């Protein structure tokens, strides 16, 4: 919670410095938060927490007294405003805390219900073997003690974000890193893989790169650490050298093949997956969104959506072709209707998200539909 407050205060700080000559070169119209580990939690939760009721769900109440664990009258609200001045200092008040996009590396959300339609677009990378921020939905525990029940990692978060339409501005992509992510999903699904809470991985999810490292409990392959540094940090904190050595040894349990080469390779992979989605999601120069939607003359209604048995396409112009892909980019069906309205039997389609490219022979429009 304090991390959410601090992140919002940081956004306000950069907006404030923009008026002071912009020493940090910030484009205040395009602010993205990227976090890994705890930072991923902060970014994902910051994107969704906007109601008092969300931080006062039953699981966030004291089990004995039913008093909220987060008392905004003491600690301030999620913007960092209000509360007891002895416990919360308001920073850079008067500037916007708004952001434009979230990038999450191995983080999770306190409760999936926080995520709602209209939240900012999100992209994620996550190991299905992560034991702290579970890939799907499970309990947050440390040292065997459950802290919070039913937290949700990137697999469930991104599925819901996509289903709500929050990522609609990110088109289907077919670059090498997107294909690699799809192949990883295919490998996990075919192997009957589960996450650290034994949730089955049954479908691929757009805008999520599932990282497969081969280590059974790994959650942060982009990390690098060495014994000399961890010992030095421990001693700087007034702790015995042995405690730093123990921290190093403990980290090897989940990342036994740690190296700079490995860490930077995973960092490069994650950024190469993120960056095209940043460009398209924020409509930066070089985006590909306009390629399929450049001509606004073609208008298509897709209904019902979600669907179970059939999907109809009603176009403002003659439909030459309809090409349907599943959410992994696999070609499912290609049709040549040569009419303005066409209905497709989808009763044999697997449940999930699909993308239809509708062409009138001159322009193409892509529409998303869901099979339940």
Predicted features along the sequence, with ranges:
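Mobile cap/lid helix-loop segments that gate and shape the active-site cleft of serine hydrolases
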Residues: 48-114, 120, 134-152
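Glycine-rich nucleophile elbow surrounding the catalytic serine of serine-hydrolase chemistry
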Residues: 35-45
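Gly/Ser-rich "nucleophile elbow"/oxyanion-hole loop immediately N-terminal to the catalytic nucleophile
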Residues: 1-5, 9-37, 52-57
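Loop/turn elements at helix/coil->beta-strand transitions in domains of secreted/extracellular proteins
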Residues: 27-31, 40, 97-102, 118-122, ...
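C-terminal outer-membrane/trafficking sorting elements
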Residues: 294-372
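Catalytic active-site module of serine/aspartate enzymes centered on a nucleophile-bearing elbow/loop
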Residues: 231-287
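Active-site-adjacent alpha-helix of alpha/beta-hydrolase-fold enzymes
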Residues: 120-226
């Amino acid at each position: 919670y304090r991390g959410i407050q601090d992140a919002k205060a940081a956004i306000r700080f950069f907006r404030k410095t923009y008026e002071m000559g912009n020493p940090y070169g910030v484009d205040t119209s395009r602010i993205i938060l990227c976090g890994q580990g705890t930072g991923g939690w902060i970014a994902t939760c910051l994107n969704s927490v906007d109601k008092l009721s969300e931080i006062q769900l039953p699981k966030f109440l004291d089990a004995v007294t039913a008093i909220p664990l987060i008392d905004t009258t003491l600690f301030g609200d999620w913007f960092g405003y209000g509360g007891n001045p002895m416990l919360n200092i308001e920073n850079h008040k008067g500037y916007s805390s708004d952001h434009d996009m979230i990038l999450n590396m191995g983080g999770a959300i306190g409760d999936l219900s926080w995520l709602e339609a209209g939240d900012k677009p999100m992209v994620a990378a996550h190991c299905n073997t992560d034991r702290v921020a579970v890939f799907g939905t499970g309990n947050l525990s440390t040292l065997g003690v459950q802290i919070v029940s039913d937290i949700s990692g990137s697999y469930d978060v991104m599925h819901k974000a996509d289903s709500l339409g929050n990522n609609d501005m990110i088109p289907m992509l077919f670059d090498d890193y997107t294909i690699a992510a799809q192949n990883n999903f295919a490998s996990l699904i075919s192997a009957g893989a589960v996450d650290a809470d034994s949730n089955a991985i049954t479908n691929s999810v757009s805008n999520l790169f599932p990282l497969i490292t081969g280590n059974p409990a790994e959650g942060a392959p982009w990390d690098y650490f060495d014994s000399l540094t961890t010992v030095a940090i421990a001693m700087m904190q007034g702790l015995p050298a042995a405690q730093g050595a123990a921290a190093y040894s403990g980290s090897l349990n989940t990342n036994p093949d740690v190296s700079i080469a490995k860490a930077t390779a995973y960092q490069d992979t994650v950024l190469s997956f993120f960056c095209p989605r940043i460009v398209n999601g924020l409509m930066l120069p070089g985006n590909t969104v306009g390629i399929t939607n450049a001509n606004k003359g073609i208008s298509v209604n897709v209904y019902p959506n979600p669907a179970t048995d059939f999907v109809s396409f009603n176009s403002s112009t003659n439909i030459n072709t309809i090409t349907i892909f599943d959410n992994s980019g696999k070609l499912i069906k290609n049709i040549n209707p040569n009419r303005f309205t066409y209905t497709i039997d989808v009763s044999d389609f697997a449940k999930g998200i699909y993308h239809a490219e509708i062409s009138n022979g001159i322009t193409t429009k892509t529409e998303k539909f869901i099979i339940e």
